[in-house]
Curated annotation (Swiss-Prot):
Keyword vocabulary terms for this entry: Aminopeptidase, Cytoplasm, Hydrolase, Protease, Serine protease
Catalytic activity annotation: Hydrolyzes Xaa-Pro-|- bonds to release unblocked, N-terminal dipeptides from substrates including Ala-Pro-|-p-nitroanilide and (sequentially) Tyr-Pro-|-Phe-Pro-|-Gly-Pro-|-Ile
Annotated protein name in UniProt: Xaa-Pro dipeptidyl-peptidase
One record GO biological process: proteolysis
Enzymatic class: hydrolase
UniProt subcellular location: Cytoplasm
GO terms assigned for molecular function: aminopeptidase activity; dipeptidyl-peptidase activity; serine-type peptidase activity
A GO cellular-component term linked to this record: cytoplasm
Record HAMAP family: Aminopeptidase_S15
UniProt similarity note: Belongs to the peptidase S15 family.
Subunit architecture: Homodimer.
Organism: Streptococcus macedonicus
Principal localisation: cytoplasm
Amino acid sequence: MKYNQFSFIPRPIAIAEQELQALGFDITHQQADKKALENFCRKIFFNYKDTDYPLHQLIADFETDLLTFFNSERPLTADIFYTISLQLLGFIPHVDFTNTTDFLEKIAFPINYQKGHILEALYHLLVSRQKSGMTLLDDLISKGLIPVDNNYHFFNGKSLATFDTTDLIREVVYVQSPLDTDQDGQLDLIKVNIIRPKTSHQLPTMMTASPYHQGTNVVANDKKLYKMEGDLAVKPARTINVETRDFEPLAAPDVDLPIGESEERFNFIDPYTLNDYFLARGFANIYVSGVGTAGSDGFMTSGDYAQVESFKAVIDWLNGKSIAFSSHRRDQKVVADWASGLVCTTGKSYLGTMSTALATTGVEGLKVIIAESAISSWYDYYRENGLVCSPGGYPGEDLDVLTELTYSRNLLPGDYLRNNAHYQEFLDEQSAQLDRASGDYNQFWHDRNYLPHADKVKATCVFTHGLQDWNVKPRHIFNIFNALPDTVEKHAFLHHGEHVYMHNWQSIDFRESMNTLLSEKMLGQDNHFVLPTLIWQDNSQEQAWTSLAEFGSSNQATLALGTDQKIIDNHYAKAEFERYSKNFRTFKSELFTGKANAICLDLPIKNDYHINGQITLHLTVKSSENKGILSAQVLDYGEKKRFKDVPSVLDLYAIDNGCNFSREALKELPFTKAKERVITKGVLNLQNRTDLLTIEDIPANEWMTFDFTLQPSIYKLEKGDTLRVLLYTTDFEHTIRDNSNYILTVDLDKSNLEIPIENNVGL
């Protein structure tokens, strides 16, 4: 384990003393260091009547147990303090460490003890993580250090788990949205599942906008999947025009109805454990699936601002600006009198996407978004550079396939009976508008692009994203992060995993950082918390995170690709084509080792490079026909230690998100030897070689010169490493599988690779 602590706020000694005493620690700044430490340790073991026993089981050094030390005249030294602290954090002498000083350096221990400043050190110790992934204080509170009294308590600017999760209110309301997506003449009602503590305090809300949470129709999804095999279409040359327009909601007038309570309860809804963490700390949790989902009205519009508006209406209800009913009868209103009106949205993938989209509406009350692996433009999810481009791992999926998956109203037989015929007409229209035949950008996709609306964002934006996420690719966070106005507070956590959550990783205090941030933004704590703009997981060493100023450097290094001309044959023998089509992972494996139809270039790295941004290929290419796909990948090639892209479980159920509540596993990305690591990749329709909105003819056998910008990344290369550049046509994971006979020729002498370099490293 290594410490990467971003959540700690240094406090004046008077405030630290006050906060420690409020928790029951008999410590003052006038006490001798040794006595203060003994009082602290005995309080730690509050569940023991005889605290001598647990002290007897710890050591002060490798020759003396802790009880003996406290009963002796020996002075407290830094080495003894650190040895005791490590044990309180779960590190075991003779198992985890045999030399305290060496181990402190190895784990980058964040606490600096100085004689006469024991109180500050103990204050810091309480909010430092144990080996189990919980802070020492969170662990103590989960065991009953202070009462669970449904009131707010804070330490180091963080809300503590003092809200009772054994006796929660679970209720359902139906919010009226300014939509009629199914055109039945009534405004669509949106089902809202609410979980909140029983308290007199007005609560801020953690809201997860999840089209999945009311069920998914896997059967309909699988039937709708597209066949990937086919010929690449030749498109007529033209310029595409689109219009950015604001969504116009329908009028949703208030109605004079009696006010009552919810009439519907529930026992369980699939939780997001980060929400659970905040539930125990005085935040309501709400789960909303939006239009076209079971329990709600309307059709699934999939990614446009009508869908977003169905979630926005819920935030408006929490702020008294829209109404909710107690049932589908619409005869009694429910008021969110328990809510403060302040909202943080959470969730990964589609859930995080709706967080980003909601932020671009500028809705009042949305204070923070925590958008994880979020889409910023749906075109960039299902298309790329004029090509159909399936998200990684899901060949054959498209937006209308996702519509079928999430239109959970069809899982309710009554709704199916009444609405399916009309819904199928709606779905057919959606399938036509997404224009799978050409792969081009159009108004349908532009209406599902949140980037043109980034200027409306007011909320503090927190993003997490995997630089190995080939499902929601890194371009999504790169684009939205850099599109936000300078007035917006923004933060990004970039890791080397794939499409995964990171809140329960051992190496970074993400939960505590979010607690500190939300306690300031939504609970009125005057924290003056400074969270770095960008926090990046260093790929060159295990469990190391560092802060960077920006995502995307303007400094460039140029690498030559060669001096000759090389060809890429698009066509495969039938058996080989079928083998790759059957299992795209076989194709990827053979591509990386130079066995597929590809130009394979190994570039020796002569300097240390810290890549930050979008790698660009400057290419001179010709095609034997009037069409062509060009795909590219850039690998860090050669065996060395690298991160795996899926976290492993270190300790099952180690993390308690409250008081014996919503336990979850502690995880971390393994750092092991591997043959290669993809740094970036991309696909391009050569007819879109200039830009996305310009479709050009491809003159057969004539040279074309263009720039091919790949997915952004942040990655360290060391002198002596090898960059493997792969240029090929069909990508069996992502693109249409065209097996026609054409050849691409690349003039390497007139081509190069441009790498964005952080802080001039390598220039």
